[in-house]
Regions:
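Domain-level signature for soluble enzymes in the chorismate/prephenate branch of the shikimate pathway
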Residues: 1-290
Length: 290
């Protein structure tokens, strides 16, 4: 039996994504909900779970930085992805439709900022660990409003005050991408399918045009960059007078594709200082493109 951990409680979009990813695994699975993304990552790293599911990217709000950092710091591998449309609603207890406080996950509050401004601009917004936790809190306290999926609100017996209240961008439905992570690579290469690969690059050198060099290498090896994120380096990098940066690149292709392998080798050669055997490029995993 495979144990899969995910951010709880159960009635969240993460829980739904976890169930969908579990259906692809050709073994019996047990789903375990935990209190935080860090707990999910550590449960896998410490062999308490075989796999974990974490939100990685939202169409409206962008990158979930903590997700990639936890994968990197715990030396995990991304082996799958699930994309879910996100449709958020507002619920209240039938005995008390107080509007003084609105509860939800910080990302959900941000994704509904326009609707909240139009309808409840004077309400205090209070973050919770998940959307389902917000629904549970309002149900138990019999006060306030909760933003969650309609299913979660109904499960906790709340009245629907507003439906599909998320911000709209160019008429596109909001979505979140979720990663399935494990301790080892698990996505085999099939030439008939399309893949994405997440690569972490921590240059131990600095020169003008360094980022352009990285992007030129992917272009030279006929690889398309889907996303690029930068952040202060997580590793100890000694570059005098500068704040060292690292880059996450999501690239179309599988880690075992010949072009990808050649590109990774080239980046490793160019990004590390001469005469020092330092890890500067790490492949965080390959997964089927949604």
């Amino acid at each position: 039996m495979k144990i899969i951990s995910h951010l709880g409680p159960k009635n969240t979009y993460t829980g739904q994504a976890t169930r969908m990813l579990a259906e692809r695994i050709e073994e019996e699975t047990e789903l375990v909900d935990l209190a935080s993304l860090e707990a999910v990552a550590r449960s896998v790293a410490l062999h308490e779970a075989d796999m974990g599911v974490m939100a990685y990217y939202n169409y409206l709000e962008g990158l979930v930085q903590e997700c990639l950092d936890l994968i990197y710091e715990n030396d995990l591998k991304i082996t799958g992805m699930q994309r879910l449309p996100i449709v958020l609603s507002l619920g209240a207890h039938s005995e008390n439709h107080s509007t003084a406080e609105v509860y939800s996950h910080p990302k959900a509050l941000a994704q509904c900022s326009g609707w909240l401004w139009d309808h409840y601009r004077d309400s205090k917004q209070i973050p919770t660990t998940s959307t389902a936790a917000a629904a549970q809190r309002v149900a138990e306290a019999k006060s306030g409003l909760a933003i969650a999926s309609s299913e979660a609100l109904k499960k906790y017996g709340l009245d629907l005050v507003g439906e599909d209240i998320g911000n709209k961008r160019y008429g596109r439905t909001n979505f979140t991408d979720f990663y399935l992570v494990a301790r080892e690579n698990g996505c085999a290469f099939d030439k008939t399918r399309e893949y994405l690969t997440m690569v972490a690059i921590t240059p131990h050198v600095d020169r003008p045009g360094l980022l352009a060099e990285i992007l030129q290498q992917t272009a030279y090896h006929n690889l398309n960059n889907v996303k690029i994120h930068s952040r202060p380096a997580l590793d100890d990098v000694a570059i005098e007078g500068l704040e060292p940066q690292m880059f996450y690149l999501e690239v179309v292709g599988h880690r075992n594709n010949d072009d990808m392998r050649r590109c990774i080798d080239s980046l490793r050669y160019k990004m590390k200082p001469e005469g020092r055997d330092i890890e500067v490029v790490r492949v965080l995993g390959s997964y089927e493109r949604p």
